[in-house]
Amino acid sequence: RDAHLDIVRVLDRVGAPDRVVFHCFSGDAAFAELVARRGWYLSFAGTVTFKNAQNLRDALAAVPRANLLVETDAPYLTPTPFRGRPNSAYLMPHTVRAMAAHLGTDASMLAAQLSSNTELVYGNWDDEPVDAPPGPFAPPTTPIDLPPLGPR
């Protein structure tokens, strides 16, 4: 969280991949603008609904909607009014509605924009998967032998 500018410097120095997502965005409006100017995405979790998170709502309002994503960060960061319970995908509409209310737009319109943005970043279920960037985080090319689940 305290390394926002450091990560931008690193990405600028080594070269950012085609798609950069700031997972569970926690920066302020100025940092949000910096990220968006580079064409990167800001993904907001349930924290944007928290009473004390005006800085996140300001960041949300500071960037073009084409740079926005939404996430659960499950099982953490459950949106208000369900804080204290495990987060899950079924609670995402609460986050989207709160985002839409803050932006002064219709939740369905924002949901459509978020869905479109998500497909641009990750592809969709009907298409071939979006290629992962090469490097240590690329998906394995051979199956991984996992131990069986259950008591040890």
Segment roles from a protein language model:
Residues 20-22, 42-44, 68-72:
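Hydrophobic faces of well-ordered beta-strands that scaffold small-molecule active sites
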Residues 35, 68-70, 81, 107, ...:
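Bulky hydrophobic/aromatic packing residues
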